[in-house]
């Protein structure tokens, strides 16, 4: 009997696992296509087997990492497992940080010591922006307090031996495979597939190798960042600190400055390839461990006409924006890749500046119709482009593309596979036939690999620029972007920007709300998704939310309240008499609510569902209250914080000028989710203050203050269906589960379609016409 019970339990577990796998997002499902575009070296990791671990799990490096004599003057520790630790209080911190951002992934950046990690992808990004293997190892040795472990040197050589050495360049509308290493070109040409891709002349002979010398000069003018009107990020080495710096390290810093400013002559060897075989060529180069790095020589592109667009004189780049663009245009060509900047730090201006630099047709893709409108406004604000040259393509706005230079659309519009309207088909045909110089991909972290491939096959662009604030995904598929778009070109430090006044100084707080006894009793008893509704609709959480809204409205603050659950969103907003936006809200109503929020002093609070997580530009907002969220998503937490990160006018930089409250019901699953969600922001240097009691809450007149009101709310929650407990599914959102089945409790009447059917009996007087031909027998029994 025990064996049978065990088998039954195993069956139930396997069914549960199967159900949970079916609940995964579409982009979580592994696909063959995402693997074929990743070189095998990219999956390699640093060997950590030699690291000793004590009984408490701490790593002991004392025997492996002997200190140098002048270690106090050097800012880095390089551990054998690939982790690098940087002293943020070092006088040469700025130079060391710039170098580490180029070669490693930031892991954690609190106030005093920052942690980075060497990965295959970060080293791929390093060589793609011009760093050589010898440069990386030499710089690490000079900056490190200890000797660099041999395993780290071998790992760097393994990952950089082939990455970034071969480029696919578009010049004069012809494609060339180019490299500054002639031996690599000869190695590639020995492969029969690549020889087949090589262009041949009329006699059938392969075209000759082309050797040329070009000067790498930045396409971004240095004057763009002068007079930036804000605090300088420069933290150069002061005169007092130079005496403590070893001579070899000081010479290295001076050389780094010269390398950034000097023009460099590079000799390259290239051969021309057939345009129709580009995709086959790229796949073959990846198999040979020489992935092609795409570069666009836009200055020599004569086939695609220049568009009439320039930056306005009022558009002034901040130092970090200029630095990110220098990574993109560092050698006079446009590199494809991803730029990571915090929300509110001016990603849109970076995109507009890139479009003004390339000066070719530009396609911008966002993730909602609101973001399309905001991108159009950003182009008109920062550039000289005429309104008639901007074309929008959304479900609501389909501008005529005649004479269009900048097209703005959404991922869902381009990736749409079902039947379109006649007008939409015409616009799609026009998008497909255009040769785009630049494609700007906003909120690029949200795009699953398969969806993005679909977009790539529809439109062709010479250069792709991805913009995001959070290069993280819970499914670890963010690495796919390295080969679908390009390497990470630049990532800013959130705390540095905050301390310099470029983004708001935010006080993050987690407010613990005790569950009322009645709600907690039901929470423990119920095992369905309705548990989510119970801890979201907790009366004490509602009262805390109402108190915070009243408190900040008295200070004339602008408040956004976020809720992933639509049932809770409506209940809170209607009870508090506040406007709310969610999926079905029309585009016109959304814009009206947002405009009122920005300019109407009487509208200081709005409620928004998950549709507002990204691409909602609300610079006036300085308070955010979160009442429900998407599980333990780190990305969503950072995106929501970004709604209040924009620098506030007239605020003192030393004081907190924005507030982020996350309301959590105590002793529920929500507390575990909250801890997971905060990981990304804590790694960026933010700290969360835990508030167990809001001072002054007892004096306020708040809703649900009596047991009767709380009992009525509980009955309303219990009467809701499991479908009400689910999160909102946003139309057009990638990975949505709208096409999948969902489990919920039901009754036999529901299954028969009788949910809204009422059985009623009533008497009606018979008309004379109906009783005219009645048999006498039945007349006798009539009442």
Swiss-Prot record:
Chain ranges of the Helicase C-terminal domain: 543-703
EC category: isomerase
Q: Where would I find the Helicase ATP-binding domain in this sequence?
A: 328-489
The protein's superkingdom reads Eukaryota
Q: Which family does it belong to?
A: Belongs to the helicase family. RAD25/XPB subfamily.
Gene3D superfamilies (alphabetical): P-loop containing nucleotide triphosphate hydrolases
One GO location term (cellular component): transcription factor TFIIH core complex
Q: How is it modified after translation?
A: Phosphorylation on Ser-752 by CK2 controls the 5'-excision activity of ERCC1-XPF endonuclease; phosphorylated protein inhibits the excision activity and thus NER. Dephosphorylation reactivates the 5'-excision step. Phosphorylation has no effect on transcription or the 3'-5' helicase activity.
Motif placement: Nuclear localization signal: 6-18
Q: Which reaction does it catalyse?
A: Couples ATP hydrolysis with the unwinding of duplex DNA by translocating in the 3'-5' direction; ATP + H2O = ADP + phosphate + H(+)
- PROSITE patterns linked to this entry: HELICASE_ATP_BIND_1, HELICASE_CTER
A GO molecular-function annotation: promoter-specific chromatin binding
Chief localization = nucleus
Locations of Basic and acidic residues compositional bias? Answer: 1-11
Against NCBIfam families, the record matches this protein to:
rad25 (TIGR00603)
Report biased composition (Acidic residues) as residue ranges: 20-30
Put simply, this protein is called: General transcription and DNA repair factor IIH helicase/translocase subunit XPB
One Pfam family per UniProt: Helicase_C_3
* Regulation acting on activity, per entry: Phosphorylation on Ser-752 by CK2 controls the 5'-excision activity of ERCC1-XPF endonuclease; phosphorylated protein inhibits the excision activity and thus NER. ATPase activity is stimulated by TFIIH subunit p52 (GTF2H4). DNA translocase activity by this subunit in TFIIH is stimulated by XPA, ERCC5/XPG and XFP plus ERCC1.
One GO biological process term is: positive regulation of apoptotic process
Subunit description: Component of the 7-subunit TFIIH core complex composed of XPB/ERCC3, XPD/ERCC2, GTF2H1, GTF2H2, GTF2H3, GTF2H4 and GTF2H5, which is active in NER. The core complex associates with the 3-subunit CDK-activating kinase (CAK) module composed of CCNH/cyclin H, CDK7 and MNAT1 to form the 10-subunit holoenzyme (holo-TFIIH) active in transcription. Interacts with PUF60. Interacts with ATF7IP. Interacts with KAT2A; leading to KAT2A recruitment to promoters and acetylation of histones.
What residue intervals traverse the membrane?
Answer: none
Give the organism the record lists. Mus musculus (Mouse)
